[in-house]
């Protein structure tokens, strides 16, 4: 099958974009990921950095990646049930190992588990319309659960939202020293992530996967629509997303990031805007692809997308080495941490370009495929039930 270079580029953008938000999760305590006032006070530049990243990136790149993951499920259907289930089960295992032994911000476990459910929904959907509508419904269910959690939550702040000094020191201790203590805390994090996945986030993740599968089945993610359609759709969707999200960002600032409002209720506009912006970003890339494809950097980012799993794990390897093993954790604020993003991006891009000069797949992708072959046997041409 001939590769869709535009799709690879969009996937590469998603992987690189995720690091814009993850860098604060590597370099700061967990509470800082959503709460810029996690330590009780906040500088103007920290607030503006948070606001900018929240507007353009928070949730958007993860949503874009979920969309493409769903598109991948649609593309895998001809390989058959055993192949798909083996592939996703191996991803679950890899995500569990990654989350337990390396980093507490893993997304692979969640994607693998939800994918094991969603691929059947994709297979059994009778039409593009039903697949898309089911995805929208599941996503809205997730938003409804988030609203319910906000309504029943206590107005008093949580230690997870604004940790005290002892909690921050303890997190710094186990992240820098590693060992059994770190594994124990990461195991707790995996458990909490699974609870959140089952209760709320899994609905949204499943919804975006089904929407991505619908867009692939319709030909939209294959680039089969006009450039004018992609451009108009992209500008409109991004504008809608920004319009939804911007007032919520301003309101969180006005409320001084109060727990009940900002941890739950005002997350909803961000979550609602994310699909609009994510699909809008993808649409603009497709719409301007004739111009974008002239640049060598764009084709290099497409190489990152071809090795998405390898590059996601490479980001973990580089950032955990810098912030945990070399002791840079909590040495930089949110804006300063962005200075680390570009060197990591360059590492992703250079490694991908050089590797793909000699090999067809990334190293982790190759291993994943070989293990899938051993577990499932050769892929078959018709999806078995």
UniProtKB/Swiss-Prot annotation:
A Pfam family it matches: DUF418
Gene that encodes the chain: yeiB
Keyword Lipid metabolism assigned: no
Keywords carried by this UniProt record: Cell membrane, Membrane, Transmembrane, Transmembrane helix, Transport
Protein name: Uncharacterized protein YeiB
Keyword Cell membrane appears in the UniProt entry: yes
Residue spans crossing the bilayer: 12-32, 50-70, 90-110, 132-152, 195-215, 233-253, 272-292, 312-332, 335-355
Function: Involved in transport.
Subcellular location: Cell membrane
UniProt record similarity statement: To B.subtilis YxaH and YrkO.
Membrane-related topology note: Multi-pass membrane protein
PANTHER family the UniProt entry points to: INNER MEMBRANE PROTEIN
GO cellular component: plasma membrane
């Amino acid at each position: 099958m001939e590769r869709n270079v535009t799709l690879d580029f969009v996937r590469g953008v998603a992987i690189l974009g995720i690091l814009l938000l993850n860098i604060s999760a590597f370099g700061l305590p967990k509470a800082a990921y959503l709460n810029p006032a996690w330590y009780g006070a906040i500088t103007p530049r920290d607030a503006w950095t948070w606001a900018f990243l929240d507007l353009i990136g928070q949730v958007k790149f993860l949503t874009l990646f979920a969309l493409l993951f769903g598109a991948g499920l649609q593309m895998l259907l001809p390989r058959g049930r055993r192949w798909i289930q083996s592939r996703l089960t191996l991803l679950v295992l890899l995500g569990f190992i990654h989350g337990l032994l390396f980093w507490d911000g893993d997304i692979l476990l969640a994607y693998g588990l939800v994918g094991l459910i969603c691929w059947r929904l994709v297979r059994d959907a009778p039409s593009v319309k039903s697949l898309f509508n089911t995805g929208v419904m599941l996503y809205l269910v997730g938003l409804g659960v988030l609203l319910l959690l906000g309504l029943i939550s206590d107005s008093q702040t949580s230690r997870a939202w604004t940790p005290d000094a002892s909690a921050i020191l303890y997190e710094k201790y186990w992240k820098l020293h590693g060992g059994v203590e770190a594994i124990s805390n990461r195991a707790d994090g995996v458990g909490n992530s699974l609870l959140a996945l089952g209760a709320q986030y899994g609905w949204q993740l499943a919804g975006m996967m089904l929407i991505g599968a619908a867009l692939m089945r319709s030909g939209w993610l294959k680039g089969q629509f006009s450039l004018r359609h992609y451009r108009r759709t992209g500008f409109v969707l991004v504008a809608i997303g920004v319009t939804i999200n911007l007032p919520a960002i301003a309101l969180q600032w006005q409320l001084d990031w109060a727990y009940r409002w900002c941890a739950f209720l005002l997350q909803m506009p961000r979550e609602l805007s994310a699909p609009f912006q994510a699909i809008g970003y993808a649409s603009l890339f497709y719409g301007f692809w004739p111009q974008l494809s002239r640049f060598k950097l764009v084709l290099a980012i497409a190489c990152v997308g071809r090795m998405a799993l390898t590059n996601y794990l490479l980001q973990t390897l580089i950032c955990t080495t810098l912030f945990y093993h070399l002791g840079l954790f909590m040495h930089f604020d949110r804006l300063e941490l962005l200075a680390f993003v570009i060197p990591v991006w360059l590492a992703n891009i250079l490694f991908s370009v050089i590797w793909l000069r000699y090999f067809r797949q990334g190293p982790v992708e190759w291993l994943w495929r070989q293990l899938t072959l051993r577990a499932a046997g050769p892929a078959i041409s018709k999806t078995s039930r």
